[in-house]
Regions:
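Mature-chain termini and adjacent capping regions
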Residues: 1-195
Length: 195
């Protein structure tokens, strides 16, 4: 069992996707319908079709609770109404048009560490343009865009628990393969002289 887990974790590391490094220094822009700011507690609550943009990072949900650390880094928790999903999308460095996107019942984003956690019915996809290259489905997925690491667990707590279900990893072919050339037709045997 430990060997299977080690192989799965190795596969997840191989699926690494680096977020666009320029996003780190960008300002955050938050669109909302309703806003409540508590300066003493350093908490902001926004509701109503929330869109958070920070460089190429885009987070969407129905509600966001934004806490500011003493170092002035944001921790954002996005939730939504039943039947809907919170989502994120971010451009990655490298390649012609690489992206990573995902959705879950709850999304947590830590500005200091650039980690996105997807909790509850989580899905994450890597794309080249609009073509999916890889996908992970699990109850909990953590995406560390600075270290280029994905981690998935079968329980929304972020732990792997026996009997809690299974995740799924889909890996697309890395390059197009050409069909092998057709085999040459078999040469009929030469006629034999039976006389």
């Amino acid at each position: 069992m430990k060997k299977i887990i080690a192989i799965a974790l190795t596969a997840l590391v191989a699926l690494s996707a680096s977020a666009e490094k320029a996003d780190v220094g960008k300002r955050a822009v938050i669109d909302y319908t309703t806003l409540l700011v508590d300066e003493v507690a350093q908490v902001t609550i926004v509701t109503g079709n929330i869109i958070v943009t920070k460089g190429t990072l885009m987070l969407r949900a129905e509600k966001a609770v934004i806490k500011t650390s003493p170092e002035e880094d944001m921790q954002i928790t996005l939730t939504t109404i039943p039947g809907k999903m919170a989502s994120f999308r971010q451009k990655r460095d490298g390649g012609p048009d690489p992206w990573v996107e995902g959705e879950a019942q709850r999304i947590e984003y830590d500005e200091r560490t650039a980690v996105v956690k997807l909790v509850g019915n989580a899905h994450i996809r890597q794309l080249e343009g609009s073509t999916m290259t890889d996908q992970i489905k699990s109850e909990f997925i953590s995406y560390d865009s600075m270290r280029e690491v994905f981690a998935a667990r079968n329980d929304a707590s972020g732990a792997s628990k026996p009997g809690q279900g299974r995740g799924q990893l889909i890996i697309a072919p890395r390059k197009a393969r050409t069909a092998p050339a057709p085999a040459a037709p078999a040469t009929p045997p030469a006629p034999t002289d039976a006389s």
